[in-house]
């Protein structure tokens, strides 16, 4: 029973991998057809409706003041980061965009957690390294040399994701549903303001609305289970395992968009799979 409980945080994190990976695949597709900030705002609306309804139906207790503030800060950072990430993906220069955002987003919280909660152990560290290598190899492409156009946005997105992880962890053991709902409200406020003041508001075709709605449901689902993983386990474990989401994005792109699956990506998949038991154990 104890062994089963030990793997529950990892199970939550890997569920987030599936949800976030699928959401980012849809985000990359949808953000090519409409302004990235507008698309992200629609994603946030969809997610907020779902998580808000769940929180109300389950009667989950509303967070205290401290948890509420941290949730709002996390949502603001995460909302901007997601919009920048979608815009970077939509730029078409993905050679470094996805791995930079994912690895940077995981590395910063991992370092902070090591100082705050202590050294995680050599086995976990080896798993972190393998996961980082795996994410990089899975996400990178062979195309192009020089500096990709989306690199700066990818760096900012990675820093924003790191800030989201760290702040959402500070919300403590408050209801994951309400923490997710509050953070998503802040994310919508930020991205919605950018859309309105930046004059990005446009009519959106029904298929794109559908893509954004599904992406929003998947994204908020990943956020909820990530919050639970970080609440019952170490933040660095939850962040590093969850950062493997590009593997799902790449597999979906291979299946539906027939993108090339290189030898480097295969090696990255193996490294990522090998990292899971090291981090979870």
Please name every model-derived segment.
Residues 71-79, 86-132, 180-186, 235-255:
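Specific alpha-helical transmembrane segments that line the substrate/conduction pathway
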Residues 12-15, 70-73, 77, 130, ...:
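Alpha-helical transmembrane segments of MFS and MFS-like solute carriers/permeases
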Residues 1-19, 26-72, 82-92, 141-152, ...:
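Membrane-interface interhelical linkers
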Residues 17, 21, 25, 49-52, ...:
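Hydrophobic/small/kink-forming positions within alpha-helical transmembrane segments
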Residues 229-281:
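C-terminal appended segment following the main domain
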Residues 46, 51, 107-111, 120-140, ...:
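Hydrophobic transmembrane alpha-helices of multi-pass small-molecule transport proteins
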Residues 51-61, 109-124, 160-177, 219-236, ...:
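Hydrophobic alpha-helical transmembrane segments in multi-pass integral membrane proteins
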Residues 17, 40-44, 98-102, 124, ...:
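Residue-level recognition of transmembrane alpha-helices
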